[in-house]
Amino acid sequence: MKKISIFLLALFASAGITQASIFDGSCGANLTWSLNTQDSTLTITGSGEMTNWHGDPDFAPWYDYKSYIKYVSLPDGITSIGDWAFRDCSGLTSIEIPNSVTGIGSDAFDGCSSMTSVTIGNRVTSIGNTAFSYCTGLTSVTIPNSVTGIGDYAFYECYRLTSVTIGNSVTGIGSSAFGGCSSLTSVTIPNSVTIIGEGAFFLCNGLTSVTIPNSVTSIGGSAFLGCSGLSSVTIGNSVTGIGDKAFKDCTGLTFVTNYAATPQSINSNVFDNVNKSTCVLNVAKESVSLYQAANVWKDFTNIVGVDDYTINYVDKDSQALYNHVVTLYVPVAPTITGFTFVGWQTVSTMLTDGITLQAVYQADESFSAPAVYTNPANPAQKLSKNGNIYILTDGKTYNMQGQLVK
C-alpha cells in the first residue's frame, strides 16, 4: 500500500499537480491570517491593530513559511502594520497599504529584497525604524502628505532606489533613513522638515544637488557623508547646527550656498576632502566678511555675496501677472597681477537667460599699465582701458545664474 501511495504522489507531481497547504491563525485582537502555499498569497482579514513582534523567538506566525509568500492582501479596516510583520519575506514582490492604516511598524518589511513596488496609504502618519531597509528591489517611493516622521534606517541600503518624494508634513528624517541608497538621484526635502538626522543620506552617490529648506534647523553628523556625486548644496537660513562630517568626502562639490546670516560654528571635518580652493561658497552679500573671518568657512578661497531679486512678469499693458524671487550668483572674477577687481558692469539690465557681465578692474598705483594689457599668466585675458578703469575682454561671457527661491 505504501508503494502505491508513493507511486501516486510521483504521478501527481509529474503531471504538475501539487497539493496546497493552508496555514492560518490570529494576528491581532480582530485580525486573522491565512496562507495558501499554492498561490503564495498571505491574506489578512478583519480590522484593527496588528500584533507587534520583536524577533527571535517572537516572530510573526507565518515567519516559518515566509519562503512561500509572494503576495500579501491587507483589508480595509486594518489600522497598523506590526513590528517585524513581514521581515525577511524575500519573495514578496509588492505591497499596497490601505488607507485605513496609520502606522507602519519597525522592521515591518525589512529584508523584502524582491519588493519592487510599495503603495503607502494616505492616512499613514509614521514609518518605523528599519521599516523598509534592505528592500533592494525598490526603485521609487512616494511618502504621502499624512506622514510626519520617517524612522531611523527606514529605507537603509535600498540601493536601487532612484527617486523619493517626501510628503509636506514630514518634520524629521531619521538617522540613516536613506543611507546607502547609492542610486538615489533626486530627493526633495519639503519645507515642513526641521531635522535631518545623522547619516540620513550618507553614501547617496547618485545625488547631484540638494536644497535644505529654510525650515530645517539642524543637519546631523555625516548626513551627506560620501555623496561624491553631489555638486551643489543649498543650506537654508534657519540652520544653526551642522554636525561633524556632514559633507565629508563630497568630492564633487563645486557650489555651497549658505543662507544663514551668521556662519554656523562647525568642526573642521564637516567639509573634509572638499576642494575649498575650487568650490565656491555663496553667502548673503552682507555676510561675506563674517564668513571670511569664521573658522572653517574662511578656508573657502572663493566666498561670493549673493542677492535676491524679485522678478515681475507683466503683460503688454504693464499689468502684473506674477512675481517670484530669484537669487543671483555672481561669478568669481579672474585674479590679474597688478590690478584690483572692483566689480561687475552689466551690458544689459533685461534678465532673459542671464545678465551678461564685464569684469571691471583698476590698475594698482605701483603698476604702470598700457591702454591694452595682456595678462602674461593667461594671454587670452586682455584688459582694455576705459577712462579710469579697465574692462576685461577675454573672449568669455560671464553670466549671473538665476535660481528660483520662491
Task: Write out the residue ranges for each language-model feature.
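LRR flanking "cap" motifs
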Residues: 24-79, 332
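Secondary-structure capping and domain/repeat boundary segments
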Residues: 307-365
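Structural signature of tandem-repeat unit edges
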Residues: 41-48, 66-80, 90-103, 113-126, ...
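C-terminal outer-membrane/trafficking sorting elements
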Residues: 365-406
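Consensus positions within tandem repeat domains that build extended binding/scaffold surfaces
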Residues: 82-87, 105-110, 128-133, 151-156, ...
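Bacterial N-terminal signal peptides
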Residues: 7-15
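Positively charged n-region of N-terminal signal peptides that target proteins for export
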Residues: 1-4, 406
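Boundary at the C-terminal end of the N-terminal hydrophobic targeting segment
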Residues: 18-20
